[in-house]
Amino acid sequence: MSNAEIPIIDIAALTGSDQAAPQGLDQIAEKMHTACTGTGFFYVANHGISKDLVAEVFEANRRFHASPLEDKMRVKRNAWHRGYTPLASSTLKSSARFDSARLPNLLESISIRNELSPDDPVYKKVPLQGPNEWPDVPGFRATVERYVAAVTALGVKLLEPV
């Protein structure tokens, strides 16, 4: 599938963006339904997340991944699957046809999820709810938290037409 085949849905009507002619909620809902039942996913235009914030989170991640392995291992993935996963340290069983995965993933990542306070009523009801592992990279946590807040707000907005 090429990029040209992935639907682009303009959500300016949801975000208040004036960069494009706004579509009504019904039109957005129809396009989302068509995309989700067709290709299974879509690009979002006029989402309202600033290019500066996107650049900042990419830069924060670049700085983390440029850190020495010893530093990254201090925030290795914990029991709640949050934190650093070193390159080739995991395998993914992608099909029931195989007894086990044969090759390690060529993946290096840091997993950060929404963090709830232990006294939040949802805390014990949500699987894998626990603390994030935050690296000691200046500005990393603040930048990632701002980005997570922005994409969470976007996710809530995307539910409006549904």
Predicted regions and their residues:
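Peripheral, non-catalytic segments flanking oxidoreductase cores
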Residues: 1-161
